[in-house]
Amino acid sequence: HPQAVLAVLAFIAFIALGMPDGLTGVAWPSIRANFTIPLDALGMFLMAGMTGYLVSSALSGPVVGRWGIGRVLAASCALTGASLIGYTLVPVWGMMVLLGLVSGLGAGAIDSGLNAYVADHFGERMMQWLHASYGIGITSGPVIMTFALTHLNSWRLGYIMVGLFQLFLALCFASTLTVWEH
């Protein structure tokens, strides 16, 4: 059942969409110490992510119309996953802020693209489950980061775990392109 596969992927994508949103609050004290930045630097990071999110949300309709929802979801998950992993590799705070913008670009396209797709193809009831899936993701993000900090002694490993999950999801979307376009 191709539609069932798409529904499951959509739910997993919204879980993955919520995860990064739940990581930063728990990781922030460690990130701040790592980069030796002031407390208010978090505002720059959040603003960058929000800016990317708003831009891609606003442009997602024409982009999906041109490239198709499957390609946009695959590319957006890859962008978000690469950004999350990139957070762990950058040597300076400004680069992490820039990656926050890129991550926001990916997240905004996933959110608006999937919302539109599910509303058009599955209906209102599935929209409720889609948003419940986001709740699972945003709830699991702090658990993942707490585990990374307490058992692995690194905020970076929390972002790597979620980034790898996003990259895996990008491969899932890429491998189901033909199903998304029908």
Each language-model region and where it sits:
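Extracytoplasmic
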Residues: V5-I37, S57
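Short hydrophobic/alpha-helical segments at membrane-entry points of transmembrane helices
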Residues: L9-A10, V92-G100
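Residue-level signature of mid-helix packing/kink "hotspots" within the transmembrane helices
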Residues: G22, G49-A58, T139
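Helix-breaking motifs and short loop linkers at transmembrane-helix boundaries and internal kinks
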Residues: T36, G68, L89-G94
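Helix-to-loop junctions at the C-terminal end of transmembrane segments
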Residues: S56-I69, L149
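Structural signature of the two symmetry-related core transmembrane helices
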Residues: R71-G86, G94
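Cytoplasmic helix-loop-helix junction between adjacent transmembrane helices
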Residues: L99-Y134
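Symmetry-related core transmembrane helices of the 12-TM Major Facilitator Superfamily/SLC fold
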Residues: L157-S175
